[in-house]
Amino acid sequence: MVKVIDIGRVVVKVLGREAGRKAVVVDIVDENYVVITGPKPITGVKRRRVNINHIEPTDKKIDIKRGASDDEVAKAIEAAGLVEYMRERVKPSFVGITKAETK
C-alpha cells in the first residue's frame, strides 16, 4: 500500500513519545523521511524529521507551501477550521510485530 504523503497532509504519529498526536507535513526529505510540525502550541509536536513508517496520513490536508514556518502552519490550520481536530489525540493503530510476539 502506497501512503499518500504530500506537503500539507495532516498525519498521525504512530510511534514514539508523540504517538497519537497529529501533525502536518511541511517538507519531503526523501522517499523515507519527511519534516513535520504540530505546531507545538496546538498539538505538542515540535518540528522534526520523521520516518514515513512512523506516521499515518489522514484524509485532511491544509494549504501551505513547502518549508512553511510554524506560524504559517498555525494560521493555515485556523483558516481551515481544524484547530479542535488537530488537538484531539487518537489511539495509534500501528500494525506490526511487537516485542511480546517475538518471544
From Swiss-Prot:
GO BP: any one term: translation
Keywords associated with the record: Ribonucleoprotein, Ribosomal protein
InterPro entries: Rib_uL2_dom2, Ribosomal_eL14, Ribosomal_eL14_arc, Ribosomal_eL14_KOW, Translation_prot_SH3-like_sf
GO molecular function: RNA binding; structural constituent of ribosome
Keyword flag Ribosomal protein: yes
Keyword Ligase: no
GO-annotated cellular components: cytosolic large ribosomal subunit
UniProt similarity note: Belongs to the eukaryotic ribosomal protein eL14 family.
Protein's name in the database: Large ribosomal subunit protein eL14
Organism: Pyrobaculum aerophilum (strain ATCC 51768 / DSM 7523 / JCM 9630 / CIP 104966 / NBRC 100827 / IM2)
